[in-house]
A protein has these predicted regions:
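All-alpha prenyltransferase/terpene-synthase fold signal
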Residues: 1-168
Length: 168
């Protein structure tokens, strides 16, 4: 699980959050300390975003998010959802569907239901909250140190709120 979370954090965080936040800091002439805080915030937001993306792929409404509803299962993508499921007694019923290129909607729904029953969905929803809380703590620290203007803090909080509640 630790490896999956680390990979998820760096995969999405770097190009979607860390680099854009650092670029914004450079463009407005922020200090290196501000850049460093923004990088930490970006890593946390990126992890939350990726975990939320994984949840949407398996449990989300495809009409809402526009993705293939079972692509992660079909591709055998090792996510936090799967890592948790592997540790449960439900794994045998899930594994037979995992990584099957020919996964049909009925079997995909059965795997999704088992993932929900074994607690994977709840577990990963809890994981989403942790990096959002860490991002908020890092943001408060940066604000307290006078490294970020209030408008930047407000924008980052709005972004974090969208990350945590996204449905697509």
């Amino acid at each position: 699980l630790r490896t999956i979370l680390s990979t998820s954090a760096y995969k999405t965080s770097t190009y979607s959050f860390v680099l854009p936040l650092r670029a914004a800091a450079v463009l407005v002439g922020s200090s290196t300390a501000a850049e460093d805080h923004l990088a930490v915030i970006g890593r946390h937001l990126g992890l939350a975003y990726q975990l939320q993306d994984d949840l949407l792929s398996v449990f989300g409404d495809p009409d809402e998010h526009g993705k293939d509803p079972f692509s992660d299962l079909r591709e055998g993508k090792e996510t936090a959802i799967i890592a948790y499921a592997r540790m449960t007694s439900q794994w045998d019923g899930i594994e037979r569907h995992f990584g099957r290129a020919d996964l049909n909607p009925t079997d995909g729904a059965a795997a999704r239901d088992r993932l929900r029953e074994c607690g994977s969905e709840s577990f990963v929803r809890g994981l989403v909250r942790e990096p959002l809380e860490s991002a908020d703590a890092a943001l408060r620290e940066a604000e307290a140190a006078g490294l970020l203007p209030a408008a930047a803090g407000d924008a980052i909080r709005a972004l974090a709120s969208r990350v945590g509640s996204r449905s697509r």
